């Protein structure tokens, strides 16, 4: 067992150090870009409700879960337990998969909006696709570095 795991010392930050350490700094950007996806998808024209429903579910779920997780880190709820490192890695892996699926489906919806709809709706969906892929990239990077932290704990 690694020395840090044996002694119960966690490498997770608490307090406002969450916003100054990597990869936890990415919480801010995940929050911003996830919120943009949520806003753009909810305000855009819905050509296929089932696809847009999954995109909304994924973006709202990740937005709320990221907010709650960041808040719990700030208040120090992890209490230096290593199980929170596992939770962090697992959540970001799941969020990466959710957002990747949502990004692909949102791109499909935008492609189908190309003909026969107002240009405004097409631009809103294209913006949602771009921000969704940015959010996916942020979650993937956070997941990779969380897995590295988990492996070394």
Swiss-Prot record:
It comes from the Eukaryota. Keywords: Cell membrane, Lipoprotein, Membrane, Transmembrane, Transmembrane helix. GO terms for molecular function: structural constituent of myelin sheath. Lipoprotein. Residues 18-151 form the MARVEL domain. The chain crosses the membrane at residues 25-46, 54-75, 93-114, 126-147. InterPro entries: MAL, Marvel, MARVEL-CKLF_proteins. GO terms for cellular component: membrane; plasma membrane. It is found in: Membrane; Cell membrane. PANTHER family: MARVEL-CONTAINING POTENTIAL LIPID RAFT-ASSOCIATED PROTEIN, MYELIN AND LYMPHOCYTE PROTEIN. This is Myelin and lymphocyte protein. It comes from Bos taurus (Bovine). The gene is MAL.
């Amino acid at each position: 067992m690694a020395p840090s795991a044996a002694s119960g010392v966690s490498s997770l930050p608490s307090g406002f150090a969450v916003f100054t350490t990597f990869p936890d700094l990415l919480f801010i950007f995940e929050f911003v870009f996830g919120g943009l996806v949520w806003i753009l998808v909810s305000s855009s024209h819905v050509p296929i409700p089932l696809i847009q429903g999954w995109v909304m579910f994924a973006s709202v779920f990740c937005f709320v879960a990221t907010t709650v997780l960041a808040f719990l880190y700030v208040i120090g709820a992890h209490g230096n337990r290593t199980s929170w490192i596992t939770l962090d890695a697992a959540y970001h892996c799941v969020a990466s998969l959710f957002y990747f699926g949502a990004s692909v489906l949102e791109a499909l919806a935008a492609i189908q909006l190309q003909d026969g709809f107002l240009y405004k709706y097409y631009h809103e969906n294209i913006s949602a696709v771009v921000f969704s892929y940015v959010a996916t990239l942020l979650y993937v990077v956070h997941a990779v570095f969380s897995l590295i932290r988990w492996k070394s704990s």
